[in-house]
Amino acid sequence: MRGEPAFFEIGVPDAKRAKTFYGELFKWTFHPMGGGDQAWVETPTIRGGIHDEDPESRIDIFFAVPDIDAAAAAVRDLGGHADDPRPEEPGFGRFTYCRDNQGVRFGLHQPSVA
């Protein structure tokens, strides 16, 4: 499970428009999450989310790790940057954003135990 793509996030200014676009394109069904038009989707191979009011439109890939705190420390030891991991999101796990030693943005994901 270490290093496999585990989750993706689509950050956009308008989540409603993104849900319509990706829903039509890939035939995805979105489930409400949080407030507003934020949502999550379960594809045949990976879970993902759409959030809005993001100043930079982008897609982030999160890689699975068994221990997010240790993985974030390893990113830093290797010359990258890792935000402090977020608390557990029930049903989803823990997440953090990172940049590698050349500035490429990616995420780490520790899946929920339950």
Describe each region flagged by the PLM.
Residues 16, 29-30, 69:
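Secondary-structure boundary/capping signal
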Residues 6, 10, 31, 72, ...:
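Vicinal oxygen chelate
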Residues 22:
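Catalytic core of tubulin tyrosine ligase-like
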Residues 27-59, 105-110:
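Conserved short beta-strand elements that form part of the metal-binding/catalytic scaffold
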